[in-house]
């Protein structure tokens, strides 16, 4: 009944004209020699070793090498005890900007010692209860 309604609505000639518009497609055969390769997501990580670099800068110019390590994806521990307080404060500001740019993290782990990490490191725990503000330089 629905077919008759459609025939009367569109006309039988219209339906016959449209029948020739669609061709049957041939089945595409896939090559028999394809192999399904399974690659572990963590396979690249197993071969890479994480690295933490230790620095005790004496000049502001040393910040370039420290920032380069962060940009390469390495964590950095920086001891500022051998620096002038004003220069150390500038260096901390520079490293803070570098860490922010790479979406990393910077934590104080000693009176004048900082840990800077890139995004792929996680810092857990807190040492702030052991640190006292005894006139810190920065």
Curated annotation (Swiss-Prot):
Organism lineage: Bacteria, Bacillati, Bacillota, Bacilli, Lactobacillales
HAMAP family with a match to the protein in the record: SepF (MF_01197)
Similarity comment: Belongs to the SepF family.
Organism from which the protein derives: Limosilactobacillus reuteri (strain DSM 20016)
Listed PANTHER family: CELL DIVISION PROTEIN SEPF
InterPro entries hit by this protein: Cell_div_SepF, Cell_div_SepF/SepF-rel, SepF-like_sf
Protein's name according to its UniProt entry: Cell division protein SepF
GO (cellular component) term, any one: cytoplasm
Pfam family, one: SepF
Compartment(s): Cytoplasm
Subunit and interaction comment: Homodimer. Interacts with FtsZ.
Recorded name of the encoding gene: sepF
Primary site of residence: cytoplasm
Keywords: Cell cycle, Cell division, Cytoplasm, Septation
Domain of life: Bacteria
Protein function: Cell division protein that is part of the divisome complex and is recruited early to the Z-ring. Probably stimulates Z-ring formation, perhaps through the cross-linking of FtsZ protofilaments. Its function overlaps with FtsA.
């Amino acid at each position: 009944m629905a077919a008759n309604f459609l025939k009367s609505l569109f006309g039988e000639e219209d339906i016959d004209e449209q029948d020739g518009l669609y061709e049957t497609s041939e089945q595409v055969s896939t090559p028999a020699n394809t192999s399904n390769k399974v690659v572990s997501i963590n396979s690249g990580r197993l071969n890479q070793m994480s690295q933490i670099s230790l620095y005790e800068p004496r000049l502001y110019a040393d910040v370039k090498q420290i920032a380069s390590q962060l940009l390469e994806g390495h964590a950095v521990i920086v001891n500022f005890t051998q620096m002038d307080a004003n220069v150390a404060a500038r260096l901390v500001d520079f490293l803070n900007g570098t860490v922010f740019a790479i979406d990393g993290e910077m934590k104080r782990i000693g009176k004048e010692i900082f840990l800077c990490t890139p995004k792929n490191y996680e810092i857990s725990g807190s040492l702030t209860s052991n640190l006292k503000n005894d006139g810190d330089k920065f």
